Amino acid sequence: MSVTIEAALKAATEQLQQSGSDSPALDAAVLLCHVLAKPRSYLLTWPDKILEKPTLASLELLLARRRAGEPMAYILGEREFWSLPLKVSPSTLIPRPDTERLVELALDKAALIDGELLDLGTGTGAIALALASELPTRQVTGIDLRPEAAELARENATRLAIHNAQFFQGSWFSPLADGTKFALIVSNPPYIEENDPHLSLGDVRFEPKSALVAAENGLADIRHISTHAPHFLLDGGWLLFEHGYDQGVAVRTILRDLGYQNIITEQDYAGHDRVTLGQYKTEREA
């Protein structure tokens, strides 16, 4: 039986709708475009085109993964962040739009102080590469504990021809030479509590738990980074964190107790507390 593009899209949309996709028609179209290696305009222009059996078989494999709830970014192997097409894999978190708020605030502070930038827990390299793309004369370093993540970030830098970003594997500050100083340190660290029910829902089910979960009510890694960051910050440098919507007070308290100054929490595009930043100064203001 011959199957047209229009018929395949209709059947795929119905399957994904039944499996609970939030955007079944869009998902179906994107997956078919991926299999055909064609833009979406092709589907609209040639709705009566007959699809070959290998194409249908490839589409069904992708649909099965999506019906099981696997994130589209992992199925496609790519996600856009800060207008940069980034390769992603199950070894890294999927870059999210809310994290662009962290990039915006980092760029604001980078304009106030010269020096290199550091991204801790870099994953795909999304934050580091966004900053490097906007600040081509500044060196940006990204660090991730997982070797496969650091390698993926390097691959993304190469694919995007971004030459002022470098990536290392290691635990937080461990790969850095003693005496290395940065104008800004940014991080989207693990900040979810171990028993958070959201860990069993949606895309998060498929993402690496080590990049999501932290002890001490989700604050352990934020506390660790905050404690050691002054050793690597220039005088007047800034530390910026992405964190959970209900962690603003706790993160501000951590920074205040450690002597950071000019501490503020900023909201994401939905109006939720999302980024907290503080400034390191060798002399405390009166």
Curated annotation (Swiss-Prot):
UniProt record, GO biological process: methylation; translational termination
Entry keyword annotation includes Membrane: no
Sorted UniProt keywords: Methyltransferase, S-adenosyl-L-methionine, Transferase
Gene3D superfamilies for this protein: DNA helicase RuvA subunit, C-terminal domain (1.10.8.10), Vaccinia Virus protein VP39 (3.40.50.150)
One GO MF term: protein-(glutamine-N5) methyltransferase activity
Keyword Iron applies: no
Highest taxon of the lineage: Bacteria
Binding site for substrate: N188, P189, P190, Y191
Family indicated by similarity: Belongs to the protein N5-glutamine methyltransferase family. PrmC subfamily.
NCBIfam families: hemK_fam, RF_mod_PrmC
Function: Methylates the class 1 translation termination release factors RF1/PrfA and RF2/PrfB on the glutamine residue of the universally conserved GGQ motif.
Protein name in the entry: Release factor glutamine methyltransferase
The species this protein was found in: Vibrio cholerae serotype O1 (strain ATCC 39315 / El Tor Inaba N16961)
